[in-house]
Design a protein with these regions (language model features):
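Long, contiguous binding/interaction regions
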Residues: 1-299
Length: 299
């Protein structure tokens, strides 16, 4: 039985449609891999792809995408609201079916070695693949971003896991890892005050004393002139969607600010959305396995 892996590369390009189209074409170039979704954000200047495939072919398409990005994205000319350090900024592998997290760690290491050997891009391993505890957190790995990486790589504790202590001149540095599924979730505030978004992000994120399974930053969407709380939710069983939404709404109200809306980036597990519906509709004794029609149709 095939071992199924999800790969969610994040690219530092969300404005040039020709480059995005090239990434889409590359993502579809390997048999046995399906491009499930891709989304681009001009304000963030970033694109997120979601692919699934068997454990061998997913490695090939991941390498091809990193290669295409390194040849077509120049970070010396990049501007955007989202933190970034590489043309392919992050490359996580997620176990989906008949494969363990430990096996995904080995996939991450194999792909990392090839990327560095053939493309000359230094690699940091993160999350479950991290070589040391302080590298599990992507925010710590990416701190300094592209512009600060040349100096960071010379620090005693920040030698890349693969490659020399110097960045690729245009493609920067890539973080490759293995992790469990997460939701990338953004909440748009009815204000143009970035400080409010930053303050709310600080309150909810685990690293500053908030929710353990929440990562958050404040960003400014220049094209809409609004502030946004950009969130990664890394454990949906222990930290559901509705809880972060209600917390952000409560904190925003303290500033006299409302919420314009929210968005899910990429794909999300159905149960996470059903849990939110169950909470807001106050459904009693709901059984997700038995009462969702599609669960029966899909077997």
């Amino acid at each position: 039985m095939a071992k199924i892996v999800e790969c969610i590369p994040n690219f530092s390009e969300g404005r040039n449609q020709a480059i995005i189209d090239g990434l889409v074409e590359t993502a579809k170039s390997v048999p046995g891999v399906t491009l499930l979704d891709h989304s681009s954000d001009a304000s963030h200047n970033r694109s997120v792809f979601t692919l699934v495939g068997d454990d061998q072919n997913i490695q090939e398409v991941a390498f091809r995408l990193v290669k295409y990005a390194s040849e077509n994205i120049d970070l010396t000319k990049h501007q955007g609201e989202h933190p970034r350090m590489g043309a392919t900024d992050v490359l996580p592998f997620v176990p989906i079916k008949d494969i363990t997290s430990e096996e995904c760690v080995e996939i991450a290491k194999t792909v990392s070695e090839r990327i560095n050997r053939e493309l000359g891009i230094p690699i940091f391993l993160y999350e479950d693949a991290a070589s040391r505890p302080e590298r599990k957190n992507l925010a710590k790995v990416r701190k300094g971003q592209f512009e600060g990486m040349p100096e960071k790589l010379l620090e005693p504790d920040w030698a890349p896991d693969y490659g020399e202590r110097k960045i690729h001149p245009t493609a920067g540095v890539t973080a490759v890892g293995a992790r469990m599924p997460l939701i990338a979730y953004n909440i748009n505030l009815d204000t143009d005050d970035l400080e409010i978004a930053n303050n709310i992000a600080k309150i909810i994120r685990g690293s500053s004393g908030g929710y353990k399974y929440c990562k958050a930053i404040g960003v400014m969407l220049e094209d809409r002139n609004i502030a946004q709380v950009s969130i990664n939710m890394v454990n949906l069983e222990k930290f559901p969607l509705y809880r972060v939404f209600e917390t952000v709404r409560f904190e925003a109200k303290r500033y006299g600010v409302g919420i314009l809306g929210s968005e899910v980036i990429g794909l999300a597990p159905a149960k996470a959305l059903i849990d939110a519906a169950e909470y807001y509709l106050q459904i009693e004794d709901f059984d997700y396995g038995k009462q969702v029609l599609e669960n029966h149709l899909l077997g």
